[in-house]
Amino acid sequence: MNWLVWALLLCSSAMAHVHRDPTLDHHWDLWKKTYGKQYKEKNEEVARRLIWEKNLKTVTLHNLEHSMGMHSYELGMNHLGDMTSEEVISLMSSLRVPSQWPRNVTYKSDPNQKLPDSMDWREKGCVTEVKYQGACGSCWAFSAVGALEAQVKLKTGKLVSLSAQNLVDCSTAKYGNKGCNGGFMTEAFQYIIDNNGIDSEASYPYKAMDGKCQYDVKNRAATCSRYIELPFGSEEALKEAVANKGPVSVGIDASHSSFFLYKTGVYYDPSCTQNVNHGVLVVGYGNLDGKDYWLVKNSWGLHFGDQGYIRMARNSGNHCGIANYPSYPEI
């Protein structure tokens, strides 16, 4: 457990006796049972209870405002409900945008092209099941393999889960990636290009921790010839790529509690910034109740959002920086 988590727990524990609400004891027990929560020490449970109560208040007030038409999305007390937004970002969102990144925008847009009003690559069988990255900042790896999985399906007709652990263990310092401490999708693609392949998830399973590189060419499940970067901040180019090419890897700002507690609807939080810190996969787009959205696959398990997915506001000023660093691989 890193210093930030300890600091949060200590502060919460010190105040817990003041704020605990005994009327919520039953609901706390139900929530723990639902998500299989167990705590090693009493102090940790007390601290988690305080954070949980704070999040519950946030969810309750937000959903009340939603019922009055003030928000386009609802929140819920999911498996992350006993964590702060700072913890979630520290443990599960470690996108590292290269500081000296020579962007090579090779995508050619066609402004006269008629695009479909909606797209969902899940319906075309190009998206694998939602994964759970755990307490490891490997979001970049899951975003990258998700984009490549779709390209493999489109070329071969076979949908195969690729190994995020292969990237965590092997696409490391040479590429500016740091395993569970973060990385970037284009650098993951570059590793696959240089390595001439990536193993399947079945042969190189995910462990949610850094390990020694164990790539085995005999278990290679995909290759990558190059990757394409889209123009910075262009939602139009992102829509075109998602419509014509397949799922696209992107970075977003996921640093707010409204994000990790999202349940359903079209996510729009005015406090969301252009500073991206989490890698995800855009697998489609559409419109819900008059709100344009991006359909985004996360790697926080099925309990997050809508079965692991979130609909994020589209055509709303590049909300959360979703169009800042889009890229996709080619086989």
UniProtKB/Swiss-Prot annotation:
Q: Which reaction does it catalyse?
A: Similar to cathepsin L, but with much less activity on Z-Phe-Arg-|-NHMec, and more activity on the Z-Val-Val-Arg-|-Xaa compound
Biological processes annotated in GO: antigen processing and presentation of exogenous peptide antigen via MHC class II; proteolysis involved in protein catabolic process
Tell me where it mainly resides: other
- Give the GO cellular component terms, alphabetically: extracellular space; lysosome; phagocytic vesicle
Q: Which Gene3D superfamilies match?
A: Cysteine proteinases
Location within or outside the cell: Lysosome; Secreted; Cytoplasmic vesicle, Phagosome
- Enzyme class at the top of the EC tree: hydrolase
Which cysteines pair up through disulfides? They are: C126-C224, C136-C180, C170-C213, C272-C320
Biological function: Thiol protease. Key protease responsible for the removal of the invariant chain from MHC class II molecules and MHC class II antigen presentation. The bond-specificity of this proteinase is in part similar to the specificities of cathepsin L.
Q: What is this protein called?
A: Cathepsin S
Species annotation: Bos taurus (Bovine)
Q: What is the lineage of its organism?
A: Eukaryota, Metazoa, Chordata, Craniata, Vertebrata
